[in-house]
């Protein structure tokens, strides 16, 4: 009698397997001995660059040049070995650098250096991911971002002023590369979003503190002729500061219902202070778009809040003198003392749009050149309308890229909104998603009257909301992490039983 053994294990034996971490992300190689040599080279290059800049711009203090370039070199080393750390540091410090120009730095701008560093490090990181097999197929929104950049390249090539357009293309490249990097890491592990939000929250500290100092001590009259003291925080213009605040404050508000008590109090304080400074920028477009975003957010949290927000906005508009005069001044054609207004009213914008529209006939296909409108008008100003700017400066190609990006983002936002309404998300995911939609809508509303298209610092933070919505919509292999941090079990049970038929002896 011959017994044939099968490979199957008896039914009584449990096969325990190590659970695969659902949310773990890939690890890149750790620094080796070569890192010390690379750091030494970075220090030498930083000092050499500082001496070079010193010879070109002798009025710039050497300590600022050397310190900035050394910091950039060190940050670059961090990015080559730990890109997530690099990304978080960049998001935390970028708002502090926007206005570091002119007196202290001359033509030397730390924000520009950080942008170039972000391009180089992020490009190397993405290439490294692809070479290592870690690259994930971008979402449709990722492809839309790439198309947005590619379709503006002809605009740069045929630009009437390539010097101006060159800087704008660098800014656009940094936006697209950072978006792709954020999307890739969220596809790896959606919990990374929490770290991004924390880093971005830390980035609000310097602009808020600077804004308060300006409001109480060092504020200056608005050069646009409004007669008001407008604050710009650490940004180059009050409108940019207001756009940044409208997006950031809405995201913070959306997080409040998901936090523990002590963190909730911090978020409430931060959103209150941010809203106060937003009012103090006297940027009317940002006021209206922020109100729109808060109404949308309130409609998903508690519909009774809608009436409270409308009533509060009305009281501020009527009761605060500066706000009331700013709203009344919206359609005025003259400034204080009867002086003609420059760029401070809807009427001026309509007139300016009419004057610059003939520029579209110069090169209908690729436009006059990205960021080149201001070089062709006596006012030397941007179009103050991002839709018009995309067509005038990018031509038909640029407009296709920009409108396609907006269409794909709108589709993603609509899909996420519908899923949130159906209750398909956990508590935290729901509020973050709705907050991202409200914040993005708030900025999108400013595209009609503000220069948002090439506002690099704003786009860097819009990328967070865009990438979150894209991963939720199309990242089928990536699930949003639960509120706790423990790893979830795989969908398939690790306990397997052998079917009875597989454990029989054959004679």
Segments from the language model and where they lie:
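N-terminal signal-anchor transmembrane segment
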Residues: 32-125, 154-158, 443-445, 461
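Hydrophobic transmembrane alpha-helices and their immediate junctions
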Residues: 263, 396-442
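Membrane-interfacial loop-to-transmembrane alpha-helix junctions, especially the N-terminal start
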Residues: 79-90, 133-146, 193-199, 266, ...
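Short aromatic-rich membrane-water interface segments that cap or initiate transmembrane helices
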Residues: 99-105, 227-239, 341
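Long extracytoplasmic/lumenal interhelical loops at the membrane interface
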Residues: 221, 231-233, 328, 336-397, ...
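Aromatic-anchored transmembrane helix interface
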Residues: 112-116, 140-149, 162-184, 204
